[in-house]
Amino acid sequence: MTAPMRQHLSQQGVLARDPLPFAVCALGISQITAWGTSYYCLGVLAGPIAADTGWSRSLIFFGFTLALLAMGLVSTWTGRAIDNHGARGIMSFGTLLVSAGLVALSRVQSEAAYLAVWVFLGVGMRLCLYDAAFAALVQIVPSRGRTAISYLTLFGAFASTVFWIVGHFLNEALGWRQTLVLFAAR
């Protein structure tokens, strides 16, 4: 390719596209769905789960508490894994874990299984939520990591708003178990 052609293509944005907007938008959509389908799902589904299973709301939210504890317990390992292997693969694996966990959660019949699935979900959430996404942005645009992280958090702020509405609609139409299966397909 000749120098004038390269300069023309670069001016048109074909060769020298800034990766920041695409990375923020792609990870932003990923974070909206990740937070909405996992972290915020009980905001809508706790009541229907309690009504269907007869379990107390305390037990239902205790499951989420166990997820938070699991997230804390694997944080150091997660950080090391991201540093050693990059964020993309870790986030992808976390997304698979969360999807599997949501399907498992939709199938639980006992309190013990319910609580165990939340521990599993906690591990998956740690691998695919903000921590890994922030690291991914810094790996993509190291010199503008702070800016990218600020933009990404704006996307994440919409997760509860979007998924409480979506979750309520799906629960009314399909029930909580099928809603979780659809959330898993994210």
For the regions a language model picked out, list residue spans one by one.
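Cytosolic juxtamembrane N-terminal segment immediately preceding the first transmembrane helix
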Residues: 2-30
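Extracytoplasmic
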Residues: 22-57, 74-78, 163-167
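Hydrophobic core of transmembrane alpha-helices in multi-pass small-molecule transporters
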Residues: 32, 101, 112-128, 153
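Intracellular juxtamembrane helix-capping segments at the cytosolic ends
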Residues: 49, 125-141
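Conserved MFS/SLC helix-loop-helix module at the cytosolic interface between two early adjacent transmembrane helices
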Residues: 73-112
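Glycine-rich segments within core transmembrane alpha-helices of 12-TM secondary carriers
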Residues: 143-164
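Symmetry-related core transmembrane helices of the 12-TM Major Facilitator Superfamily/SLC fold
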Residues: 178-186
